[in-house]
Each structure stands twice: as C-alpha cells, then as structure tokens.
C-alpha cells in the first residue's frame, strides 16, 4: 500500500523541519503494547470472564459482615510461615528448574543485521551507499525500518530514511514504512510528529487497520487533540470491539485531561464487552484520585477493588503503592497502609485480623461439585481422555467404596522421584498413609499391573492390599477420575498429584466457578516434600486462607505481585497490602 504526498503537503519540507525531540521516561520495548515487527489483528483473549455487575453498598456490606465473622481474638500468634506453599508465586518455576526441565531454556539469539544501523541522520548519498552494501534478500527500506523499530532508534534517523525514500520515489512512501515510523514517534513521545503522521493518514485513508489505529490513539492522548483519539475509537467500533489497550489509552487520556466522566463511561463500556481491563488502566484511576475529596469517585474506586476480588486479579507492586497512596490521601479518614505477609494461621502480620478461610461453604461446595460434574466430567471433553463405558465403570466402583480421605494420582506420584523404581515410589507413599488408617484411592493405568523393571508385581500387590485401586485403560487420563472421586467423597477429601489442572479450570463456564475451583484446589491438593523415601512422608503446608482482595469495612487486605517475582496463572502472591482506618467512615 502506498500513497502520494504531493496533494497534501511537501514531504521533504515536512521531514526537513527540526523535530520536537523530547525523550520521556523510556518505556520498555518488551512491555510496549504493540510488537515492533507486527500489527494487531483479531482481538485475542486467554479466556472470557463475564464481569460482575459493579458492586453496590449492599454487596460491600455483605462482604464486610462476612469478614467480621472471621475475626479471631488471638492477636499474640505472630509466627511467620516456615516455608512457601505449593501455590506460592515463583514456586512452579523453582520446581521446573529442580526437575531439570527449566522453562524457556536459553533465548533465541538476535538475528544479525547485514547493515550497521546509523546513529545519526544520513543524507541521500549516505543512504545510497548503505543500500549498495546491503546483501539481504528483503527490501532494504523495509529491513532497515524494521531493525530501527526493534532497536527503538532515534526519530531523527528514521525521518532521514523516509525523506530519502520519498525523494527516490516522487514523494511516494509505503504504508508499512509510515506505520513503523509512527511506532517510533509514539515510543519516544514525539507528539508533534505523531500529529503530522495523523494528518497525512487522515487525508489519504478513510479507515486504517487496527495496528495503525492503536498507535494513533496512544500517540494522540498526550496532546491537546486527545479527543480525536475518541473519534478513532468510534471508527474501530464500526468493524470490531476495540481492544482493552485501545480503551485503556482513551481512559488514560481522559484522566490526563481531567475528564473523569468520559473515563468512567469508557470503563463501563470496557467491562460491558467482557474485557478484563489492563491493570495499568485501573492504576490510572487511583493515581488520579489522590487527594480528591469526592465520595462518588471514592466509591467507584472501591468498586474497582471488588472487581479485582470477583475476578481474582492481583495488582502489581506499583499499583499496590498507588492504592496505598490513595487511601492515605483521603481527607479526614486517616487510613494507614503497610506492606506485610500472612501467617500460616491465616492472621495478618500487621493488624492481626483473620483472613478469609480457604474452605468453601457448603453452598459453594455443592455449586462447584455440580458445575464440575456437568461441564468437566459429564459435558466436557472427558471422552477424548476416556470412554463413556469406562466412566460408568468408575462411577459404579466409587459407589461401592466408602468415602475416601485421599485420592492419589498413582502414575503421576510414581514418577515424582526419578532415582527410585516407580512401583517402589508409589508403595512408599501408600504404606505411610495407610499407617494413619486413611481410606485411600490409587488411580492408575493398566500397564502398571504388567511386571517390568519399573513395575514389580509384588510391590503392586502390596499397594492393592493397602488402598482401593482403579486402573484405567492406557489411553485414558486420570484427571476426570481424580476430580470425580475427590468431590464425591466430601469436603474432607484431599488429592495428590503434581498436575495443576489448568485445563479443567479453563473448561468452567464463568468467573465464579473458576475462582471456586482454584480456591478448592488450593485447600485440597497435597504436595509431597522431596526425599521422603529416606525419611517420614511430609507435605508442603496447605493454605488456610484465601488469597483474594477482602475488606471488613475498616480494613482492606490486598494481595499483590512483587516486581521480579514470576507468577504463573496457577499461583498466588505471597505479599499483601494491609490498610487500616483510624477514623470511622461518616454515616
């Protein structure tokens, strides 16, 4: 795609002008919203979570009442947790490294450029010489501008490239060159240059692709023409739902220019499309609200905190600081925040209050059980992992047994300790648990019953004497059986597997079911401590509290992600922000 500039204004005149070159705080290119070598296509989401209706005072009061019933009088117990739990942030990565299978082993080496990118603007002769030395098969201009975007080169250097291209092609510049130049202008916060490119595109095109819209929106929000970003958002709406980045940029532009009504209206549109807002968007609302004496705005910020709770979202460290700063700036309320941890007992190390229990209420348990049976076992993709006949056979087997205390993923557990024989590993675990008079269920595959170097017949016979056993076909997977047996045995039943059950959580239909599943999983999945074969069998401690935003009215407890501590989607933060109010809220 190309365009001619002669009908708009002289391209050479435009690019000879001295740029307004003010380097703002550099945004990491790795975290920037648009990949430098690609444009945004169809909107993609890992999962769709229907946002809860914005909470009102009644919902907040119910939450406060629930939290107050959990308060304990034992304020003297200040002993910290002696070790991380299985779902603590960063533990999955540690386990991966310990098992000799680290994630992301190595990194792809950067592609060697066949030309040395200039560090200062070049004239026509210098660009001619550089092109003569170019040995690549791709277009020289496309290759160089792509390398510039990857390196976040100076706007001046990129401008000299486009001026050279225009001079060689009678004022014609390819659309891709212009968009990548626009990327550099946005990255370096060159607002005047963004506006120049915007005027060119507006004159030549009735509509753009989504990547161009995204760049223009982010570039315009910092200028006095920020409302034109809202017009671009409307153009996107004509063909697709704007991305959460598009909405987030427009919200930040509205807040930057003091139009809070537009910002909140866009926020409601965003969640109304079942999009989860970027955390930086939510942070912008708290940053804007500092020292603001506006009850309506304050209530909307509290709604955001409850939105985090209902969707099990965790602010980053910077966002947590913004929340703390906002609370402490509320006039006349005297909120005080402290960054802290939660003890193994479930009490806050700062204020001593009890955090909500990890255990599901009877109503929550029945809801989750019915949902799992309907959407994961009966109506899910389990027949890709087993057969209807085998599932029926297992259901009859479970009904014939007493409720289990622990359900064991036999094959998974047997492979936890590579140095030991697999049947020996399994027998060691079963024997120690059987000594506690527990009702055990071992789930396995039929090949485990065939004698081999890894599966000794005498050891498997000992396993079958000490535990109920069910051996599925070799093509089957254990997870549906594990979930069925554990949930049917009651809330006391625990299970042992290294599998984090991400796929089954993803099968659940809504945010509530997914949150309850993860809460149940944290309270029921046992993780074996390494090296048990030479000592007594021990497990990592199970959390007694729920890692979720919560309030008692005069306190808030907000788990947050630490900087530089990686956390997978199946883990929870270990750091908390504790907020206490010294002055009661007005009636």
Curated annotation (Swiss-Prot):
Residues 1-46 form a transit peptide. Residues 94-114 are annotated as: Disordered. Transmembrane segments: none annotated. GO terms for cellular component: mitochondrial nucleoid; mitochondrial ribonuclease P complex; mitochondrion; nucleoplasm. InterPro entries: MRPP3_PIN_dom (IPR033495), PRORP_C (IPR031595), TPR-like_helical_dom_sf (IPR011990). Keywords: Hydrolase, Magnesium, Manganese, Metal-binding, Mitochondrion, Nuclease, Transit peptide, tRNA processing, Zinc. Zn(2+) binds at residues 348, 351, 557, 578. GO terms for biological process: mitochondrial tRNA 5'-end processing; tRNA 5'-leader removal. GO terms for molecular function: metal ion binding; ribonuclease P activity. Gene3D superfamilies: 3.40.50.11980, Tetratricopeptide repeat domain. Mg(2+) 1 binds at residues 409, 478. The keyword Isomerase does not apply. Binds 2 Mg(2+) or Mg(2+) ions per subunit. Its cofactor is Mg(2+); Mn(2+). Its EC number is 3.1.26.5. Residues 342-578 form the PRORP domain. Pfam families: PRORP. Catalytic component of mitochondrial ribonuclease P, a complex composed of TRMT10C/MRPP1, HSD17B10/MRPP2 and PRORP/MRPP3. Catalytic ribonuclease component of mitochondrial ribonuclease P, a complex composed of TRMT10C/MRPP1, HSD17B10/MRPP2 and PRORP/MRPP3, which cleaves tRNA molecules in their 5'-ends. The presence of TRMT10C/MRPP1, HSD17B10/MRPP2 is required to catalyze tRNA molecules in their 5'-ends. PANTHER family: MITOCHONDRIAL RIBONUCLEASE P CATALYTIC SUBUNIT, PTHR13547. Displays a distorted and non-productive active site that probably switches to a fully productive state only upon association with TRMT10C/MRPP1, HSD17B10/MRPP2 and pre-tRNA substrate. This is Mitochondrial ribonuclease P catalytic subunit. The lineage of its organism: Eukaryota, Metazoa, Chordata, Craniata, Vertebrata. The gene is Prorp.
